[in-house]
């Protein structure tokens, strides 16, 4: 595979939070049982003036800061999300304009449930590797919704991260050693046009959906690269909740030291398309030169994208040029359920 890597990355997380106890109280549920079952304590909530576009813009600006490049050289911007503000009006064009990348570029909004952001990374890898563009930007961001009283309401959250892909060795903070995808037609989670909330297959979302795809993608990339779990310093997986993430990591043989930096769900919730991009951003915030990372996304419907990544010495030069993911995670203000339903537009008049 040609030399292709990450030259900049940035993240964004809204400051508002709601605790599991606050939601459970309204529905008469046992918060301790929910926290234990999901391994989630609280989740992020976007303010009324935040949506996928504003989250993507903030993450993109932070990525440009770390990359230290002229945004006009970005030849492609892809925003992966299942909560684009408009059905017809691209989020990607708004982001490109906001960072000063227009007009000489291609842009598109992507959808593949929670893995649309990583699909964008693969697309940028292809365009950069072919020489068609100098830099590409891929963003995974969402303001996820869960129906009132549904299990998703305890986890569906907001946040995102952006990655700038390039091929100049002296600019790369991390190199892609390889990528692999695993895709099938698996109807575990869906939402039709015009519907406010998604529907899901309950327990069917586990073994035949999430675990089948994540584990096969992880095994596929390791077979392709000739590696084992011992070759990786860090790993990150899609995290609809903390329980699935930890089970997937342990079933592959990863230790707590390897998977803990990528696990943000307990204090963030499930950011859908932003989940793996945000988890990876936190790993990069902590990683040293030479660290090897296994990243595996998952999108319902269903598919997983896997990446084998090695961090370069340049990481230490850029990590402090933009807010770190944990700094954004720790910048928080708690709200009650009444404010939450107001902010999320759940009160229908």
Swiss-Prot record:
Q: Mind listing the GO biological process terms from this record?
A: farnesyl diphosphate biosynthetic process, mevalonate pathway; isopentenyl diphosphate biosynthetic process, mevalonate pathway
The UniProt keyword set, sorted, is:
Acyltransferase, Isoprene biosynthesis, Transferase
Q: Which domain of life is it from?
A: Archaea
Protein residues bound to CoA: 203, 243
Q: Is this entry keyworded Cell inner membrane? A: no
| UniProt catalytic activity | acetoacetyl-CoA + acetyl-CoA + H2O = (3S)-3-hydroxy-3-methylglutaryl-CoA + CoA + H(+)
Which residues of the sequence carry a binding annotation for (3S)-3-hydroxy-3-methylglutaryl-CoA? Answer: 30, 114, 205, 238, 247, 270, 300
Query: Got any disulfides in this one, which pairs?
Result: none
Q: Tell me the subunit arrangement.
A: Interacts with acetoacetyl-CoA thiolase that catalyzes the precedent step in the pathway and with a DUF35 protein. The acetoacetyl-CoA thiolase/HMG-CoA synthase complex channels the intermediate via a fused CoA-binding site, which allows for efficient coupling of the endergonic thiolase reaction with the exergonic HMGCS reaction.
| Function noted in UniProt | Catalyzes the condensation of acetyl-CoA with acetoacetyl-CoA to form 3-hydroxy-3-methylglutaryl-CoA (HMG-CoA). Functions in the mevalonate (MVA) pathway leading to isopentenyl diphosphate (IPP), a key precursor for the biosynthesis of isoprenoid compounds that are building blocks of archaeal membrane lipids.
Q: What is this protein called?
A: Hydroxymethylglutaryl-CoA synthase
Classification from the root reads: Archaea, Methanobacteriati, Methanobacteriota, Methanomada group, Methanococci
């Amino acid at each position: 595979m040609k030399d292709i890597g990450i030259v900049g990355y940035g993240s964004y997380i809204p400051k508002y939070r709601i605790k599991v106890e606050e939601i459970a109280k309204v529905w008469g549920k046992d918060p301790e049982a929910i926290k234990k079952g999901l391994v989630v304590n609280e989740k992020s909530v976007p303010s009324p003036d935040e949506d996928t576009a504003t989250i993507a813009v903030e993450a993109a600006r932070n990525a440009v800061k770390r990359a230290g490049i002229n945004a006009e050289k970005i030849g492609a911007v892809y925003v992966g999300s299942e909560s684009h503000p408009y059905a017809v009006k691209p989020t990607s064009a708004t982001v490109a304009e906001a960072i000063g990348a227009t007009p000489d570029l291609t842009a598109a909004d992507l959808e593949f449930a929670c893995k649309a952001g990583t699909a964008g990374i693969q697309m940028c890898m292809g365009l950069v590797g072919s020489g068609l563009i100098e830099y590409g930007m891929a963003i995974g961001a969402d303001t996820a919704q869960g129906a009132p009283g549904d299990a998703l309401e305890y986890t569906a959250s907001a946040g995102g991260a952006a990655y700038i892909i390039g091929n100049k060795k002296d600019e790369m903070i991390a190199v892609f050693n390889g990528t692999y995808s695993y895709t099938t037609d698996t109807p575990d989670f869906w939402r039709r046009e015009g519907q406010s909330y998604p529907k899901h297959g309950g327990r069917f979302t586990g073994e035949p959906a999430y675990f089948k795809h994540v584990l096969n993608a992880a095994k596929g990339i390791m077979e392709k690269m000739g590696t084992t779990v011992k070759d990786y310093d860090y790993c990150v997986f899609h995290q609809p909740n903390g329980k699935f993430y930890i089970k997937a990591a342990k079933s592959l043989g990863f230790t707590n030291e390897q998977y803990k930096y990528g696990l943000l769900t307990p204090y963030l919730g499930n950011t859908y398309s932003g989940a793996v991009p945000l988890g990876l951003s936190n790993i990069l915030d902590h990683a040293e030169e030479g660290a090897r990372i296994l990243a595996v996304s998952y999108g319902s419907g269903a598919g997983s994208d896997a990446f084998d990544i090695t961090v370069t010495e340049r990481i230490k030069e850029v990590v402090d040029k933009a807010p770190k993911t944990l700094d954004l995670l720790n910048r928080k203000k708690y709200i009650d359920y009444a404010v939450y339903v107001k902010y999320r537009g759940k009160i229908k008049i």
